[in-house]
């Protein structure tokens, strides 16, 4: 991993490390990742046939899904088919992401958007796949990154752009993996000094 490129970065790293030590993110981490290992095991290709509606709802809620009523309208068969396609089909990642997120996609589930789909990818492999939620975009903006490409074009290409920026945040701020990037983003948006300054402005 690269060294901090400035005192600004170094200070943010120190402040984030100190914040983690205080437990300020414990509730968020428990809510979002407390059952990540269990979820990941249930999403293994050989286990998908055992996926239940209750478990799929738990995964949806952990991803911060807010349209529970809509999501409940999906059959467990459709949910399983979408997960199987997303995680195990041979077409490129951007194609799979598009088909699961776009309103025109063949595997779009009711109530499920980029947050749920990126969460599924992430819990299967947090070293490769980042989470695309509100904090991810807001954090990038607070850190001064250009996020215009996240607002236009095919969904799959947008996710690839989000991943690229997530990898760069991981390297720049010396974070362990993309799960740490998500926690860092959450902290930046809600608790960091730059978020407080932004609120004042």
Task: Put a short name on every predicted segment.
Residues 1-110, 125-201:
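An N-terminal alpha-helical hairpin/helix-loop-helix interaction module that forms a charged
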Residues 117-124:
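Contiguous, well-ordered alpha-helical segments that form the cores/surfaces of helical PPI scaffolds
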